Amino acid sequence: MNHSTGNSSNNKEFPGSNLEFQVGHVDRVIDTIPSRRGHFKRSGGGGPCCNKASVPGMVTQRSCVYGGARVVLMPITDAAHIVHGPVGCAACTWDIRGSRSSKSDLYKTGFSTNLEEKDVVFGGEDRLLKCILEVDEIYSPSAIFVYSTCVSGVIGDDITAVCRNAEYKTGKWVIPVQSEGFRSFNKSLGHQLACDVLLDHVIGRGDAEVGERSVNLVGEFNVAGDLWEIKRLLEKMGVKVVASITGDSTVAEISAAHKAQLNLVQCSKSSGYIAEEMEKRHGTPHINVNFFGMRETMDSLISISEFFGLELAEKWVLGMVEETKRKVARYRNTLEGKKVAIYVGGNKAWSLIRAFEDLGMEVIMSGTQNGLPNDYLRIMEKSGRELILFDDANPVELSRLLNKYRPDLFVSGAKEKYLSYKLGIPFCEFNHDRIKPFSCFRGFLNFAEEVDKAVNSRVWKLAAPRTFLNCGVEYGYE
């Protein structure tokens, strides 16, 4: 995985928008402090400054390396996940990433060694070993993942040695995850560390037999049940899913993932690296897929059917597309021409663009918290027109963007929801806190319905237009 630091650039001139939408000077998309101006660009002037440490003193919504590792590994349903650090690091485990399970619920239970001051002085290795043995005795998990945090990393606890000792005592797989938060400013390193853990300690250790036309879904985390709709369509095509890495998965399924005939790469940051490594180590080919949006789903299913030579499946897929178009038409009639702002993960940012085109809507702004240069290049390629790109926006900067350009819809996560509402801008949850699946054709209908409800709710006609504290003037930005 590429963790290089630098700006993305693309000097290609994009055709103008079909809406009356003008963007100011490239360095004055919004008013902010000089060191942040490069993070807000017009796509015609290249991508924004990205993949850099946040400016000291600025509020950021980014997560840490440990946060990146845990969202990849914790959806493994029958494993125990022990956080070796202060109890605060183990927060929000019950509904981690919104991942649903049709199997065990053990992954939702949070375990922490709850390091305190005396452990910083005397070390926490004994406490960690005791915790591992206790969890194994009470819950008997298929495997135990142990996550290092900033505190345990600073005091020098050797979690690898403790895990080796615990593995000998329990007979279970006890797997260290060296995910100290201070290792990088970008949680993407945590994604890669988690992938390395799976490659080195899990994948390849299983011996289950798999049949013909078998695949792994790599980078699918079953948010709100997305995985189940993908599996339903693949099974109708005669394709079997060996393992989902990692949503609604088990340790045994992932351990046999190397036997699948094809890897389907769903989320670029979490899965591109692991798919490339599996091809090197096990010879498993991979193709990129995207099951969000009507056309993206169609293209993905056709690519899979071509790989396995399933000619009849292609006709069935095209029939599903026509049926979905008919059902989406009533939403498109009320959404045509509306403007959209996006602030999500890098992979989601570009995949949303075509989906909104299917609804007749136009993306005028797109940003990410941890985007890499390639993410912004893909956003520009998918858009084909000029738009505003921004990186790691803090709440004041975000409020300024929304106030200045007033999109008809803002798509982001729970942390940005109430900012949007306070500004009188309709909002759609797309990250981990949504409750409806958005994958494939049925999921796209759910998405269209949610967007229509948000944009065309009568409440916005009753609410007076609002600004947010003079857009941050009181913070000394002017």
UniProtKB/Swiss-Prot annotation:
Listed CDD domains: Nitrogenase_NifE_I (cd01968)
Gene Ontology MF: a single term: nitrogenase activity
Keywords, alphabetical: Nitrogen fixation
One matching Pfam family: Oxidored_nitro
Top-rank lineage group of the source organism: Archaea
GO biological process, one term: nitrogen fixation
Segments traversing the membrane: none
InterPro entries: Nase/OxRdtase_comp1 (IPR000510), Nase_comp1_CS (IPR000318), NifE (IPR005973), NifE-like (IPR049939)
Pathway the protein contributes to: Cofactor biosynthesis; Fe-Mo cofactor biosynthesis
Stated family: Belongs to the NifD/NifK/NifE/NifN family.
PANTHER family documented for this protein: NITROGENASE IRON-MOLYBDENUM COFACTOR BIOSYNTHESIS PROTEIN NIFE
NCBIfam families recorded: nifE (TIGR01283)
Function recorded in the entry: This protein may play a role in the biosynthesis of the prosthetic group of nitrogenase (FeMo cofactor).
Protein name in the entry: Nitrogenase iron-molybdenum cofactor biosynthesis protein NifE
Organism of origin: Methanothermobacter thermautotrophicus (strain ATCC 29096 / DSM 1053 / JCM 10044 / NBRC 100330 / Delta H) (Methanobacterium thermoautotrophicum)
Gene: nifE
